[in-house]
């Protein structure tokens, strides 16, 4: 079985899609399944290039309030044909199959079984402008469709009505659980961590406004992993903002944090960072939005608050500081929640889709 994994986003686009693709390909490697990875070009050199092809210069586009690097190059068709001809994949697995010219070129040229995973909860305005009709012929070339959540399924099913199998994102439970703590920040301060791009919809500004408005009767430290933010001062709060960090350092910061704050303003397709926090034994405060509330049950494995409600956010921070038993209950329940969501299990589900699709001689669901 030969797999060609196609990721629409460049590997310098941090976020859920690349996290998913990276972990999937690592599992394919661990399980000795022959595969290659194809992405748009990137300046990042941290990924193993052995079986990694980069095609097409990237452009930063706005998508549902976030930014992503995709290729729109019309000159990649020859390279795509060459990869398909030389590698002869049994399966082409496309992540966000209509996002840019790379996955579209693979669909146009594919003679393989095509599997598509849909990650987005809103997508670009292309569909809303009716361009989804242009993609109808390409859509017919997809044999099996996966969505990472019910939210992602509901979005894409608005434009392409099919049966979607839901296979959620996974988490490296052992990796985050066994990450070492950072001694210099394990003191008497309450460590609150935010992880993600500084896009408006991610809600970092809500957290900052909360910490500026409320004075807590205990010391607080804010850790921001993501964009570097210049001239950020919040009362007497110590701020750590190293920018984007690798997975190992992220795991260490999560292990050293008391609370992960995920104050997104709009619905998310999933929320991998919530699973990572659970694996790292970190309590969670998250917005009560689609995607997040598929993972978090309020007062069970996290606290859910109204989006952009700084009063609720402040109260939740104080609650988790003051009530250690409640905090530990959330952490324990979080550990139970992710028990079956480790990447070993999730990748097995995806591999089973590969095998079943190869054994199915008919094109499914058209």
Model region roles, listed by residue range:
Residues 126, 154-157, 170-188, 232:
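Acidic anion/phosphate-binding donor-loop and adjacent secondary structure
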Residues 244, 252-257:
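Short alpha-helical donor nucleotide-sugar binding micro-motif in glycosyltransferases
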Residues 41, 151, 170:
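Carbohydrate-associated surface elements
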Residues 7-14, 21, 27-72:
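N-terminal strand-loop element at the rim of the active site
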Residues 298-299, 303-310, 319-324, 339:
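Conserved acidic donor-binding segment of nucleotide-sugar-dependent glycosyltransferases
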Residues 125-145, 151, 159:
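Membrane-proximal helix-turn-helix segments that form the acceptor-binding/catalytic region
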Residues 283-286:
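Short hydrophobic beta-strand element within catalytic cores of glycosyltransferases
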Residues 4, 184-202, 208-212:
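Conserved donor-binding/catalytic core segment of Leloir-type glycosyltransferases
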């Amino acid at each position: 079985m030969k797999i060609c994994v196609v990721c629409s986003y460049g590997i310098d686009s941090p976020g859920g899609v690349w996290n998913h693709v990276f972990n999937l390909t690592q599992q394919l490697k661990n399980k000795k399944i022959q595969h290659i990875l194809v992405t748009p070009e990137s300046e990042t050199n941290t990924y193993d290039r052995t079986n990694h092809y980069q095609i097409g210069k990237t452009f930063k586009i706005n998508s549902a309030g976030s930014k992503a690097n995709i290729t729109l190059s019309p000159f990649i068709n020859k390279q795509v044909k060459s990869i398909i001809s030389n590698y002869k994949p049994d399966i082409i697995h496309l992540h966000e199959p209509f996002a840019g010219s790379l996955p579209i070129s693979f669909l146009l040229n594919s003679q393989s079984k095509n599997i598509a995973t849909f990650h987005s909860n809103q997508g670009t305005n292309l569909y809303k402008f009716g361009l989804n009709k242009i993609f109808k012929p390409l859509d017919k070339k997809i044999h099996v469709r996966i969505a990472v959540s019910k939210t992602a399924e509901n979005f894409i099913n608005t434009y392409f009505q099919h049966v979607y199998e839901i296979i959620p994102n996974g988490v490296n439970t052992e990796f985050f659980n066994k990450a070492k703590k950072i001694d210099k920040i394990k003191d008497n301060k309450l460590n609150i961590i935010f992880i993600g791009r500084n896009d408006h919809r991610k809600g970092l500004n809500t957290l900052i406004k909360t910490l500026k408005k409320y004075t807590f009767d205990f010391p607080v430290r804010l850790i921001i992993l993501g964009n570097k933010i210049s001239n950020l001062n919040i009362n007497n709060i110590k701020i750590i903002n190293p920018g984007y960090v690798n997975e190992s350092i992220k795991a260490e910061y999560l292990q050293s944090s008391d609370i992960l704050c995920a104050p997104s303003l709009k619905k998310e397709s999933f929320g991998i960072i919530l699973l990572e926090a659970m694996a790292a034994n970190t309590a969670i405060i998250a917005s009560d939005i689609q995607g997040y509330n598929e993972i978090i049950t309020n007062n069970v494995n996290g606290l859910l608050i109204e989006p952009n409600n700084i009063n609720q956010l402040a109260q939740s921070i104080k609650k988790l500081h003051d009530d250690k038993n409640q905090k530990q209950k959330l952490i324990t329940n979080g550990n139970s929640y992710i028990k079956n969501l480790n990447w070993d299990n999730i990748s097995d589900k995806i591999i089973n889709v590969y095998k079943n699709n190869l054994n199915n001689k008919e094109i499914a669901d058209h």
